[in-house]
């Protein structure tokens, strides 16, 4: 065996060193690749979590409808099967025994009477004799509308006085200002059609021109509405004060469009008065602009919009109809969680207990009942927290509040505002829901849906003046047309007398 020379050994060592260096480079590259792969996996997991959360949110949005949220029924895509929280009454449909009943009946003398003889008598020679002896066997009435346009000519008479020789001219009444003008009935009908009827200006023009045959431009319609609103400035201040003085006030807001931009109609009302205002802000600034809440100090029923809680002097009561809808949504999202179903039952039991107490002539619930409801409330909140724990702190800190989800947000709201949720069983003047205010602003949704938007803020303000006035009049038992006619005639305070 030949002996390895020193030169050969050095060469082998150099080759091995070079190979080791190459392997070190490969290892470093592989380590770098592994680190990059690990980071990619971390980023992918993060993306998957975010997408999973987004899918969950979108699924929840698709599941929202008019039955489990505040969305209007018109937005329902796949309309859900009817589901009511009301308990069966056990009564048969229709009128109940003992009720007075209503049917189509008008106590007016007929303008025209048509007699109908038997068909066989028409060609009989004794027809006239039989007709004179006939008696009425049955009466059927047809109620129809006949449109008549009444033109009243006002003529100013000129008289030469025989005593003084001076010529005198008769004066027109103050409200007769032009050679041709529209009367109060006509103006009231036009304004009512455009505002209360939610008919657009163009369609109002078509309807009026077609029915009455009277020329009427769209500009004249707008002027009629504006003049009517101008006469309501004083009554709006009275309505505002009446709402401020309420023992229980109802407050709500809804969106609309003015000149292509989002605005918010703020409603403030009580059982006798309705006050509507508009602002480009939904929150605190919009409420301040309405000039009702800043001066209100009694019980305010609302939907828990955060801006309401900035008013520290009022007593807050929450709309339980909103809460029931949110509980329905929770039940649909998490059918395995039974606390939402039991919480709905608790609220409805509280409502029923109050109704039974009122029917019995009581003005408060028994202490035992109140204690039972309190204990059930607290137990359900505790159970809800156990099934929906707070989110854990993440390793990577993020700015802002941790996202909790709708279910946990609802639980925390029910926990934090327990007194406001239950106020209706402690104060019988406080209603279970805020339906009164929701009814008062419902026409705004209809108007927006029909007309699309208001062209100007002035047009929106004038519309809300008229709707506030009409809403208040209807609560006093007056019809919308009667109210608008009185306003056009210059007597908007008529329903106070």
Question: Where are the model-predicted features located?
Answer:
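Short, flexible loop/hinge motifs at secondary-structure junctions
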Residues: 1-180, 222, 251
């Amino acid at each position: 065996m030949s002996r390895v020379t020193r030169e050969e050994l050095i060469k082998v060592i150099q080759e091995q060193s070079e190979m080791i260096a190459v392997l070190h480079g490969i290892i470093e590259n592989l380590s770098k690749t592994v680190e990059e792969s690990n980071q990619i996996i971390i980023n992918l997991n993060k993306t998957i979590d975010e997408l999973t959360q987004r899918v969950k949110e979108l699924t929840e949005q698709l599941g929202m409808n008019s039955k489990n949220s505040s969305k209007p029924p018109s937005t329902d895509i796949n309309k859900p099967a009817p589901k009511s929280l009301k308990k069966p009454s056990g009564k048969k449909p229709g009128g109940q025994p003992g009720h007075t009943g209503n049917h189509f009946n008008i106590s007016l003398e007929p303008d025209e009477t048509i007699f109908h003889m038997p068909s066989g008598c028409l060609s009989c020679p004794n027809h006239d004799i039989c007709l004179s002896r006939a008696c009425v066997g049955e009466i059927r009435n047809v109620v129809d509308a006949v449109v008549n346009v009444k033109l009243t000519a006002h003529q100013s008479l000129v008289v030469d006085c025989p005593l003084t020789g001076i010529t005198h001219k008769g004066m027109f009444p103050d409200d007769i200002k032009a050679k041709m003008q529209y009367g109060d009935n006509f103006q009231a009908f036009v304004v009512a059609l455009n505002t209360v009827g939610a008919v657009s200006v163009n369609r109002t023009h078509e309807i009026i021109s077609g029915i009455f045959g009277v020329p009427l431009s769209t500009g004249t319609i707008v002027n009629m509405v504006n003049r009517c609103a101008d006469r309501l400035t004083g009554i709006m201040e009275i309505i505002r004060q009446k709402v401020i003085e309420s023992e229980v006030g109802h407050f709500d807001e809804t969106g609309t469009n003015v000149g292509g931009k989002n605005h918010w109609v703020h409603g403030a009302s009580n059982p006798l008065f309705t006050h509507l205002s508009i602002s480009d802000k939904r929150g605190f600034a919009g409420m301040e602009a309405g000039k009702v809440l800043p001066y209100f100090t009694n019980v305010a029923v609302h939907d828990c919009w955060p801006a309401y809680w900035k008013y520290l002097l009022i007593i807050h009561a929450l709309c339980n109809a909103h809460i029931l809808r949110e509980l329905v949504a929770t039940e649909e999202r998490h059918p395995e969680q039974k606390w939402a179903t039991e919480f709905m039952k608790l609220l409805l039991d509280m409502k029923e207990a109050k109704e039974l107490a009122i029917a019995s002539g009581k003005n408060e619930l028994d202490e035992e009942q109140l204690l039972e409801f309190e204990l059930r409330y607290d137990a359900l909140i505790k159970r809800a927290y156990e099934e929906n724990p707070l989110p854990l702190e993440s390793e990577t800190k993020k700015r802002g509040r941790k996202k909790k989800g709708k279910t946990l947000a609802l639980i925390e709201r029910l926990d934090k505002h327990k007194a406001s949720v239950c106020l209706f069983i402690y104060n019988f003047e406080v209603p279970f829901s805020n339906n009164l205010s929701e009814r008062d602003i419902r026409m705004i949704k209809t108007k927006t849906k029909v007309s699309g938007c208001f062209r100007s803020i002035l047009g929106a303000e004038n519309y809300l003046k008229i709707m506030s006035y009409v809403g208040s009049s209807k609560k006093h038992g007056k019809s919308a047309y009667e109210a608008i006619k009185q306003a056009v005639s210059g007597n908007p305070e008529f329903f106070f007398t």
